[in-house]
Amino acid sequence: MEEKQILCVGLVVLDVISLVDKYPKEDSEIRCLSQRWQRGGNASNSCTVLSLLGAPCAFMGSMAPGHVADFLVADFRRRGVDVSQVAWQSKGDTPSSCCIINNSNGNRTIVLHDTSLPDVSATDFEKVDLTQFKWIHIEGRNASEQVKMLQRIDAHNTRQPPEQKIRVSVEVEKPREELFQLFGYGDVVFVSKDVAKHLGFQSAEEALRGLYGRVRKGAVLVCAWAEEGADALGPDGKLLHSDAFPPPRVVDTLGAGDTFNASVIFSLSQGRSVQEALRFGCQVAGKKCGLQGFDGIV
C-alpha cells in the first residue's frame, strides 16, 4: 500500500533573495554578491524539507495563474511535492517578497508583498480527500476558517480506527490575537519566540509553562528559541530540551524555523519520541543555517 502523505496548508511566496556583504544603509546603493529566485512561505518551505527528508508530501495554499505561479509550481514538482490540492484563485496576485541576507552573519530581512490573494478557505478544504493523509500541518493565517478545517479533521478522526487517524500540527508564528484560538487544536502546536515574547514570556520554558493550558488534552507544545535550542512540553508535565546545533558559520537563516517544524513533524511521523524529534529538528535547522537555501540539509 502506498504510504500516506503529509499535507502542509499555508503560504507559498516567491522570494527574490539578494546576498550582501553587509546590510545596506538607507538611501544607499550597493552591489549584491548573488541573487536568486526561491520558493518560500512557511508551509511551502516545510514541504521542501519534508521531501528532502524522504516523506511523501503535498502542499495546499492559494496561487493565481501567471509567471510567478508557473515558477513556484515547477519548483514544487522539481522537489517531488504534490500540488494537486492548490486552491487556484481567479482574483489577486501570487505573493512575492524581497529578502536581503547578510553574508557576514546570516541574518535575513524580509519585505513581503502579501497581496490581495484570498487564503485557502474551509470550503476549499471540504474538497480534500482526507484519507490520503497521515499528518496535516496548518500554518496559522486565516484562523476563523482554519478552525473549521481543523474541526473537519477532528470529525473525520472520530470515525477512524486509531491507526487511521490523522495527526495534526498547528503553527502559531505571528503575534496576532486571531491566531491564538488555534492553540486549542492539534496534537502538536508550534509557538514562535515572537509570539512568546509578545505575550510577555522571556524564555521557551516560561512560554511553555504559561501557554500549556491553552492546548488540547494530550497535546505537545513546542517552542524554538533560536540559538538557545528548543523546548517541548507534553501531557506528562515533563519539560524537554534540545540544545541548538549551530553550523561552523551561519550563512542563511531564511526558512530555519520552517526547517525545524518540518523535521520535528517528520521525526514524530516516523514514530520517534518527542525528545528525539526535538533534537532532530534542531540538528537539521542548524545544518540549514550553514547553507544557502535547502540543498544539502540531508
Swiss-Prot record:
Keyword Nucleotide-binding listed: yes
Segment forming the signal sequence: none
Top-level lineage group: Eukaryota
EC number: 2.7.1.3
BP GO terms, sorted: fructose metabolic process; regulation of glycogen metabolic process; response to fructose; response to glucose; response to insulin; response to sucrose; response to zinc ion
Catalysis: reaction(s): beta-D-fructose + ATP = beta-D-fructose 1-phosphate + ADP + H(+)
Regulation: Requires potassium. Inhibition by ADP.
Presence of the UniProt keyword Kinase in the record: yes
Pathway where it operates: Carbohydrate metabolism; fructose metabolism
GO molecular function terms attached to this record: ATP binding; fructose binding; identical protein binding; ketohexokinase activity; protein homodimerization activity
Result when mutating residue 40 to R: In FRUCT; loss of ketohexokinase function; insoluble
Family statement: Belongs to the carbohydrate kinase PfkB family.
PANTHER family recorded: KETOHEXOKINASE (PTHR42774:SF3), PHOSPHOTRANSFERASE SYSTEM TRANSPORT PROTEIN (PTHR42774)
Function: Catalyzes the phosphorylation of the ketose sugar fructose to fructose-1-phosphate.
Protein name: Ketohexokinase
Organism: Homo sapiens (Human)
